[in-house]
Amino acid sequence: MNLLQNVSLASYSGMAVGGNAAYLTEVANRMEVLEALSWAQGQQLPVIMIGSGSNIIWRDEGFPGLVMVDKIMQFEIYQEDETNTYLTVGSGENWDSVVARSVEAGLTGIEALSLIPGTAGATPVQNVGAYGQEIANVLVTVEAFDTHVRDFVTLPAGDCGFGYRMSRFKTVDRGRFFITGLMLHLTKGNPQPPFYGALETYFEAAKTMLFTPAVVRDAVISIRSAKLPDPAVIHNNGSFFANPIITDEQYNYLADNYDAVPHWSVGTGTVKISAAWLIETAGYKDIHDAETGMATWAKQPLVLVNEHAKSTADVLTFKAKIVTAVQQKFNILLEQEPELLP
């Protein structure tokens, strides 16, 4: 085991801030996971396992234990027939590469999740979703090390506690499981309309008539690239807030007082509305905050970017300003998407 000490965690966060880890090591397979966990147990140290860190914000105090960086790679067809394909995917695989390879194979089910940063193992934690698709719809099982039983377990998708941008891995069992692999169920053939709003608008403008996984992927990449900053160039965690789900009564109040509130019906008595619209309408579109060195991205206020912030405290202060502004104007509480660790 190659063990590093006193490592800056800013390099393992999309926002590029945070303190140091006492220890850090990379793990490339299950045996290395066990070796690292055994060492940490012997030292009586806490352990966190991360992917690329694209959806992580580290506290300024750092982490006084062992950080395992996931490098578990696998992309294999487990089983297939004329219609269905089951893929086994290592948790350390770059997610967009997984999407690209599945699309190249003519498989549909995750093409709308193109260009989402991070690793495959992070997708169930957040129940990653975009443009009408989400990981819960295609996930069969999650393979993980369960710290309660000190062994590897296989969890069916139905046991993952999925909700909107939510899972048991993020809530009741936060920190319990170290995800090492996924099984995905994708299908052969083409996705069928109707498509999610922005995609449908894109296809109508392009007069697209044939919808293949590759066509949808290209469209999503075009849409996302036009409005989102490149995380390799500009430090950010992607969408910083989840779209709130509110009651019909709350939505009706908004609709009566504002024009064209972006919204989606998500069930009886509830409506999902655009967090970006709330932030913009509350006065935080293209805001550059001198106090914190943070900003909202000009083309998408849902994305907070680190222009010259020096600490996680700066990020959280700017976040609090936005949350307060939205709550005061709409009485709606925005919820943070990136995970604050530890």
Provide a role label for each language-model segment.
Residues 1-149, 159:
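Anion-binding (especially nucleotide phosphate/pyrophosphate-binding) glycine-rich loop
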Residues 4-5, 10-17, 152-314, 329-342:
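Phosphate/pyrophosphate- and phosphate-bearing ligand-binding catalytic cores of soluble enzymes
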Residues 29, 53, 118, 150, ...:
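Residue-level signal for inorganic ion chemistry
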Residues 98-99, 275, 323:
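Generic structural marker for isolated residues within well-ordered, non-membrane alpha-helices
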